[in-house]
């Protein structure tokens, strides 16, 4: 399941995390969203042996089952002073030019170092936006207390890399990945959806791990089922 190219990426990701820990004595924040990439970086942090603090910033509008999964993974939950609906009642709906909801609910500093599961393969915008495995940014005004170094250990990972790593490590994902896929279609829980988007063009494949009692497939057989264009 883990080919040579992916193993090199895994090794590089682990070395990156360890290199950050070598030059920083404190805990490293692990930005955990409850998504598949978060589960991957959580596993990598464990394998790297770094001192981390996995944190889920509750936006109050995440998919059903997310909080339960976060708790099951032993991740710390930070709750906002005001939820999403209280914010829009006061300020109206957010836009690309007015992102007050992100600032209030998830884009704020907790620790000096912040590991995020962002990947270039997720979108063209991210491919153009992120060039280095680490970057510095400010949450709020450009003051020292707002400065954070962000680390992207799986920046160069493809969707297939994530899929193969999840299956190889036997990672359990949030319910959303097992319950939905494609255009609001529902499938048996034996299926694992790597991209749970509601539009077919955003979910080019899904992984099926089905028993002999499900559609006649051999036990533990894994196959990639590509959507028709």
Named regions from a protein language model:
Residues 1-168, 222:
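ATP-dependent adenylation/nucleotidyltransferase module used to activate substrates
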Residues 168-229:
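ATP/NTP-dependent adenylation/nucleotidyl-transfer catalytic domains that generate, transfer
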């Amino acid at each position: 399941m883990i080919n040579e190219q992916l193993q090199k990426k895994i090794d590089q990701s682990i070395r990156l995390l360890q290199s950050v820990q070598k030059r920083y004595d404190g805990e490293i924040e692990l930005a955990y969203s409850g998504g598949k990439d978060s589960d991957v970086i959580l596993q990598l942090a464990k394998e790297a042996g770094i001192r981390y603090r996995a944190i889920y910033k509750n936006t109050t509008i995440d998919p059903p089952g997310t909080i339960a999964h976060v708790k099951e993974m032993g991740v710390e939950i930070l709750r906002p002073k005001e939820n999403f609906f209280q914010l829009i009642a006061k300020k109206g709906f957010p836009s690309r030019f007015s992102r007050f909801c992100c600032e209030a609910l998830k884009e704020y500093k907790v620790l000096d170092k912040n590991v995020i599961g962002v990947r270039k393969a997720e979108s063209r915008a991210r491919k153009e936006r992120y060039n280095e495995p680490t970057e510095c940014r400010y949450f709020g005004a450009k003051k020292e207390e707002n400065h954070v170094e962000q680390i992207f250990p799986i920046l160069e990972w493809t969707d297939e890399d994530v899929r193969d790593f999840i299956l190889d490590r036997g990672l359990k994902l949030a319910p959303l990945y097992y319950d939905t896929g494609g255009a609001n279609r529902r499938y048996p829980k034996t299926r694992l959806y790597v991209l749970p988007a509601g539009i077919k063009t955003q979910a080019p494949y899904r992984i099926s791990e089905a028993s002999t009692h499900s559609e006649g497939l051999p036990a533990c057989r894994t196959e990639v089922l590509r959507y028709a264009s």
